[in-house]
């Protein structure tokens, strides 16, 4: 099993993507530490928690730095150094025109999607330094790569998350730690339900996207889980600071051409000059 004797911390494991990722790492032999927020424990309790000593569950609000520190410390005491961090905690935030957005809700979105990611990475890095290795996988989204009207908090937080990932990759390149971000595609999830409930507030583009999702059933969460496993494995060594689409990028074929990718601007946020 590829991840035997490895410890994986999954932030936001009670969602559809987080649950699929947790199951995947468990099957590959990892020690799996899972976090959930408030009411979303039940689904986890019925699944992985019944599978024995390689699984542990922690309640966590990523907006609280001291709580993040405490959970990371508890994971270290139970399982030892953390080798893999997967941060798939996130919210869609306010949907609609920015001038009507709740200031509290807008800022809360930034806190969870961006600041929470910083807190978790900041807390886990010393453990990875001690282990002498590490893989960090962040979850971004379509709002990071292009403007997303009526979802300004979400798109701003996800774009910032990608730039955070790119910048940190450079800091960590001599530490044997790689960090990348995933765009999972339209997975059927809690966000999908929130988008439907918003009606026309998200604009015509969102309405059309929702219709397409309903027709196709969306992207399976297992697709994002498979990419997560790849990025956490030795097969992705050297690949860092990239935003990779689980759906549109041919990441299954990338292992042999990682040096080529890393010598280019592929899968990064860049300003496109006028020719």
Q: What would you call each of these model-derived segments?
A:
Residues 121, 157:
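Active-site helix of classical SDR
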Residues 181, 201-274:
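C-terminal helical subdomain
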Residues 59-70, 103:
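The beta1-alpha1 cofactor-binding region of Rossmann-like NAD(H)/NADP(H)-dependent oxidoreductases
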Residues 14-15:
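Conserved glycine-rich cofactor-binding loop
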Residues 28-43:
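Conserved glycine-rich Rossmann-like NAD(P)H-binding loop of the short-chain dehydrogenase/reductase
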Residues 126, 170-171:
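Alpha-helical segment proximal to the catalytic Tyr-Lys
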Residues 96-98, 105-107:
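Substrate-binding pocket helix/loop in short-chain dehydrogenase/reductase
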């Amino acid at each position: 099993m590829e991840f035997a004797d490895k410890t994986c911390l999954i932030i936001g494991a009670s969602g559809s993507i987080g649950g699929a990722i947790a199951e995947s790492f468990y099957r590959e032999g990892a020690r799996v530490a899972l976090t959930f927020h408030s009411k979303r424990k039940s689904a986890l309790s019925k699944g992985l928690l019944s599978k024995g000593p390689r699984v542990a569950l922690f309640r966590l609000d990523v907006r609280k730095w001291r709580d993040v520190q405490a959970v990371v410390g508890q994971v270290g005491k139970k399982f030892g150094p953390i080798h893999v961090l997967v941060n798939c905690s996130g919210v869609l935030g306010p949907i609609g025109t920015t001038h009507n957005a709740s200031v509290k809700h807008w800022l809360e979105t930034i806190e969870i999607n961006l600041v929470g990611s910083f807190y978790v990475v900041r807390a886990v890095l010393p453990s990875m330094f001690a282990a002498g290795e590490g893989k960090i996988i962040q979850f971004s989204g379509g709002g990071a790569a292009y403007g997303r009207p009526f979802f300004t908090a979400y798109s701003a937080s996800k774009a910032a998350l990608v730039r955070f990932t790119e910048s940190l990759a450079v800091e960590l390149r001599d530490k044997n730690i790689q960090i990348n971000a995933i765009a999972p595609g339209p997975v059927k999830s809690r966000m999908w339900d929130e988008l439907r409930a918003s009606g026309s507030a998200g604009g015509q583009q969102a309405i059309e996207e929702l219709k397409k999702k309903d027709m196709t059933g969306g992207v399976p969460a297992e697709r994002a889980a498979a990419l997560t496993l790849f990025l956490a494995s030795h097969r992705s060594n050297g690949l860092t600071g990239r935003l990779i689409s689980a759906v549109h990028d041919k990441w299954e074929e990338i292992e042999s051409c990682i040096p080529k990718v890393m010598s280019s601007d592929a899968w990064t946020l860049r300003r496109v000059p006028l020719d």
